């Protein structure tokens, strides 16, 4: 009996250490981390993102997705920025990632002013915030102080959310990162400025569940529209906005699309069919001039701060890379 209790206590201590370790790591982040060491850090990142945005506004969803994919694999440590045949960028879910050149540009500008000070992980977190702000979305204070990870493995990217995931699987993947159902729905609201290839949803139009029919959850009028955009004989590479109603504006229309059966991705539309996620979607979709529902812009900022604190690295297990695409 004593042996079993001893093993149980040992396991509980290990679990407690892991939980407290994550909590301590997230507390190492703070607003204005570079206020003394590199006072212009955030403004340099902002101006860099803005210059790229002015040339191509679609870079905003690319940067947001890049940050999301970084945080869900190895934590928010810039590991997705590392190049290599076996690095995260080589994983199937990461093919087509955009915005890498923006981060490299910002890093080069920062190195010229504050060499070896600002991490690539922080640049990415700041750039994601700025990309939302430039798309008429909310802005929020980004706690900084992350260090860059030294490991990037394509095999670790299997836990990234997929457009084929059920709601249960989506919930579990987010829960594994310390994010709840409210965070899940809120963060997927980023699809209001997102894009995807026809390849990732064409099956819903022509051969749903191998029946030869269309997904019945798609509204008839929207189905006609999607078939025009993505014909059955196309190569699947055409880019389609995930929120056709207001593709370049960060707003609540994405949630109204779920309500109306106008979601592009199956995983998004499924949020309407689950009672728990449906309740959150309704709160966002029904909001009218701040009188009803949740404020999506405010809640999104909170969820992003929470997500950007996932498994951050410290001086012990991280570094400040000189070049974001490779470890020092």
From Swiss-Prot:
This is Peroxidase 25. Substrate binds at residue 161. Binds 1 heme b (iron(II)-protoporphyrin IX) group per subunit. Binds 2 calcium ions per subunit. Its cofactor is heme b; Ca(2+). Glycans are attached at residue 207. Its EC number is 1.11.1.7. Disulfide bonds join 38-114, 71-76, 120-324, 198-230. Ca(2+) 2 binds at residues 192, 243, 246, 251. It comes from the Eukaryota.
């Amino acid at each position: 009996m004593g042996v079993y209790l001893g093993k149980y206590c040992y396991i509980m201590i290990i679990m407690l250490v892991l939980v407290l370790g994550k909590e301590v790591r997230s507390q190492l982040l703070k607003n204005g981390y570079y206020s003394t060491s590199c006072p212009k850090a955030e403004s340099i990142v902002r101006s860099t993102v803005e210059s790229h945005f002015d040339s191509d506004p679609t870079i905003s969803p690319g940067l947001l997705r890049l940050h999301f994919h970084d945080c869900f694999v190895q934590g928010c440590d810039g590991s997705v920025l590392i190049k290599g045949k076996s690095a995260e960028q080589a994983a199937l879910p990461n093919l087509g990632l955009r915005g890498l050149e923006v981060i490299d540009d910002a890093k080069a500008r920062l190195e010229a002013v504050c060499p070896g000070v600002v991490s690539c992980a922080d640049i990415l977190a700041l750039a994601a915030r700025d990309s939302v702000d430039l798309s008429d979305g909310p802005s929020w204070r980004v706690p900084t102080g992350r260090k860059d990870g030294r490991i990037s493995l394509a095999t670790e990217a299997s836990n990234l959310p997929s457009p084929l995931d059920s709601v249960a699987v989506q919930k579990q993947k987010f829960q594994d990162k310390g994010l709840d159902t409210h965070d899940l729905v809120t963060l997927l609201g980023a699809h209001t400025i997102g894009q995807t290839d026809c390849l990732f949803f064409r099956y819903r139009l022509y051969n749903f569940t191998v029946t030869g029919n269309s997904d019945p959850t798609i509204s008839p009028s929207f189905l006609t529209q999607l078939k025009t955009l993505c014909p059955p004989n196309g190569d699947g590479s055409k880019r389609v906005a995930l929120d056709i109603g207001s593709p370049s504006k960060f707003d609540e229309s994405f949630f109204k699309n779920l309500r109306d059966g106008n979601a592009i991705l199956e995983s998004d539309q499924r949020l309407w069919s689950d009672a728990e996620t449906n309740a959150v979607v309704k709160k966002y979709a029904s909001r009218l001039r701040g009188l009803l529902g949740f404020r999506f812009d405010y809640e999104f900022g909170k969820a992003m701060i929470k997500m950007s604190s996932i498994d951050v690295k410290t001086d012990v297990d991280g570094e400040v890379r000189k070049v974001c695409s490779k470890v020092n």
